[in-house]
Amino acid sequence: MDTGGSARLCLALVLISLGVMLTATQKSVVSLDPPWIRILTGDKVTLICNGNNSSQMNSTKWIHNDSISNVKSSHWVIVSATIQDSGKYICQKQGFYKSKPVYLNVMQEWLLLQSSADVVLDNGSFDIRCRSWKKWKVHKVIYYKDDIAFKYSYDSNNISIRKATFNDSGSYHCTGYLNKVECKSDKFSIAVVKDYTIEYRWLQLIFPSLAVILFAVDTGLWFSTHKQFESILKIQKTGKGKKKG
């Protein structure tokens, strides 16, 4: 019996199984283009499902407000958003777990504070902007956090918050002029939270590695013990042969 070949086969199977486990733990991810989770009626938005590099067509499942959609491609294009397009979106690429939900809010407002996220990881980033209905020009825009003005812009330009800290958590809104009429957006809360996924990723890497190491050590010990046992048997057989002689 080729014990060496069997052991190598077992080791290969374990490594393959670990690879499958790691792949299976990967989730699909929903992203928006443009990135705003708050949009106005009539806006165009594309939801993108990222998960793998599969070239297979119709390999994506979309779920909107717990109902499976007829859309099967990785890109779901909403040409002119309506209130009915609001809600929870989940996607699943073939061979991957379902994504975390993304919530899209379609609103009817004269002035809207748009944001790329409502929850941001510590040291992450997010964007905000003051947007008017039908893309009318907004002038003399002032951005507020917790009712305190922190940014003035003559035009409605994007504001990017990079390396966000817990101090960036708060309630945001904006004011601006539409045709010489001052308008105010509703308030929107953004929370900066601690990133626990880094610790989880380390665990994902450590446990499979430990399993492989333990298997290799166990296999090595088995071979060592097996060889010692064979040597003892040979010595015993040799001793018996000499006695008979």
UniProtKB/Swiss-Prot annotation:
Ranges in the topological domain labelled Extracellular:
24-204
UniProt KW keywords = Cell membrane, Disulfide bond, Glycoprotein, IgE-binding protein, Immunoglobulin domain, Membrane, Receptor, Repeat, Secreted, Signal, Transmembrane, Transmembrane helix
Quote any Pfam family the record assigns.
Ig_2
The signal peptide annotation in the UniProt record is 1-23
Q: What is its main location?
A: membrane
Disulphides: C49-C91, C130-C174
Where is carbohydrate linked to this protein? N52, N53, N58, N65, N123, N158, N167
The residues covered by the Ig-like domain are 28-103, 113-181
Transmembrane residue ranges: 205-223
Q: What switches on its expression?
A: Exhibits night/day variations with a 15-fold increased expression at night in the pineal gland. Up-regulation is due to a large degree to the release of norepinephrine from nerve terminals in the pineal gland and cAMP signaling pathway (at protein level).
Q: Give expression by tissue.
A: Expressed in leukocytes and pinealocytes at night (at protein level).
Q: Which GO terms describe its biological process?
A: calcium-mediated signaling; cell surface receptor signaling pathway; eosinophil degranulation; establishment of localization in cell; immune response; immunoglobulin mediated immune response; leukotriene biosynthetic process; mast cell degranulation
Q: Name one GO cellular component term.
A: external side of plasma membrane
Q: Does the keyword Transmembrane apply?
A: yes
Q: How does it assemble?
A: Tetramer of an alpha chain, a beta chain, and two disulfide linked gamma chains. Interacts with IGHE (via CH3 region).
| Protein name (Swiss-Prot/TrEMBL) | High affinity immunoglobulin epsilon receptor subunit alpha
Q: Which gene encodes it?
A: Fcer1a
